[in-house]
Amino acid sequence: MALPIILCLAVILWTSWRLLDALFLSPLHRVPGPVLARLTPLRAIYARLPSRVIPAALADFHSYGDIYLSKPRTITISHPRDVRAILASSEFQKIDVYHGLNDPVMANIVTFSDPKLASRRRRQIGPYFNPSYLAKMEELILRCGCRAVADKWGRLIAQQGHGPQKSVKVNYRHDLQLATFDIMSALAFGRWLDSLKEEGESVAIVEWIMATAVYIGVRINFRLLMVFPFSRLVRRWTRAYAEFVQFSKHAVASRKELLAQGCQKPVDLLQAFIDAEDPDSKVKMTTVEVQAESVGMQLAGSETTAASLTWAVHLFTLYPEYYRIAVDEVRGQFGPNHLITYADCSRLVFLEAFVYEMLRYTPITSSFMPRVSFTKGTTLQGHYIPPGTEIAFNLIAMNNREDVWEEPERFLPDRFLKDPDLKRSVFAFSYGTRSCIGRHLAWMEMMTILANLLKDYDWSLPEDSLYGPHHVDEKGIPIRMPSKCHIVFAPTHPDRDCQLVISRPKT
């Protein structure tokens, strides 16, 4: 009987100490937040479930404000001033959420927590993501992106079009996803798969990438699932990731073999990574590091852009008045046979404003990688935040602040035409020197694909579409199709909700 009593007392004492520390002794005890978040990370894990992300983020913001405790030793902030201060400070580094993977292929500029490694890698590959170098790759980007989608839609109209306008139904989520995956495969692995003509291997790559995203999420948030026998539940994702790693390894080896044979260097990201050199230390990237960056670009650069384009098309279908403005702008500037380049897109001011509002209204992710300083504390919203405290960011709340955005619940692209400075408050690509290294590439893809498809085709919703301008909430605002978030926000039912009727413009 003595042992159970001792164990019981130990549990009571431990629980009492945790409560005392969390509620009264911790340096963070005055920071607002729910009691449960002070004791366990379980509440935060529940809030990250794919269908819970948006409502949980908004509920916490409305309940606790600009700063709150989201789990033990972790605060979440949402005031733009605080977010800029943390992201701009060299004292605060990304937390090492990938340390449990023990996988060198996951060690890339997206995942680095060591500021020195991240800075060196940015010096090595950063010049290749500048607009001037991207312009050298634009022909490839246009061929794999807007031209590939337009060609497929044209073939479908020729083969299956019906009615006076020869209209046909397409799944824009599927086609835009394949296009962006093709772009990154061509750039990062030197392999253009022509997925929109012959899906074949590209379908496997899409499955690899989607499975890898789930696999990484499980490894970070639910590590117990990686232990036998629970690991059997995620075995198919583990296998898919292993196949993806082998694909990337083969791509790098094939390119180096071609170079050894004296072949001309292609202009793409794979070659850029092979040639990359730190101007300070003169250090080049190893074969595994090249592989890691190629994998990172495919993972971070394809699905994010595909999701952005998906939401842009969806919002055009919800707001036909904005669709008509964009169409008139594009077709008023360019003839039907003109291939719109990224330089041309500087003339499309409404379309750019529309994309900015899309990034605010339907953010692609819910946050950035949390930051931490192990040497320096800081003060946020009047609360001292000691060293070692993780700082997370509530991007959903930042995009819905009434002190920044007039009527944030409404989709209003004109706000960026009236006040261009609002663009600084869109944090879709993070902020400052640590902003997304591929942001210029993402903008090039989004603008050229949208502009050319708006020029070449008329869009409309199928008659049986569940979501459109007719399906509104109590405020008269069109309801968006449901989404879920693993790494990015994507439609929950893409086969049902991402159908579009297209036809050639009337002449």
From Swiss-Prot:
Disulfide bonds: none annotated. One of its GO terms (molecular function) is iron ion binding. Heme binds at C436. Its cofactor is heme. GO terms for biological process: helvolic acid biosynthetic process; secondary metabolic process. Residues 1-22 form the signal peptide. It is an enzyme of class 1 (oxidoreductase). Induction: Expression is under the control of the secondary metabolism regulator laeA. Expression is completely abrogated when gliT is deleted in cells exposed to exogenous gliotoxin. InterPro entries: Cyt_P450, Cyt_P450_CS, Cyt_P450_E_grp-I, Cyt_P450_sf, Cytochrome_P450_monoxygenase. Keywords: Heme, Iron, Metal-binding, Monooxygenase, Oxidoreductase, Signal. Its EC number is 1.-.-.-. SUPFAM superfamilies: Cytochrome P450. Pathway: Mycotoxin biosynthesis. Cytochrome P450 monooxygenase; part of the gene cluster that mediates the biosynthesis of helvolic acid, an antibacterial nortriterpenoid. Protostadienol synthase helA cyclizes (3S)-oxidosqualene to (17Z)-protosta-17(20),24-dien-3-beta-ol (protostadienol). The synthesis of protostadienol is followed by several steps of monooxygenation, dehydrogenation, and acyl transfer to yield the final helvolic acid. Belongs to the cytochrome P450 family. This is Cytochrome P450 monooxygenase helB2.
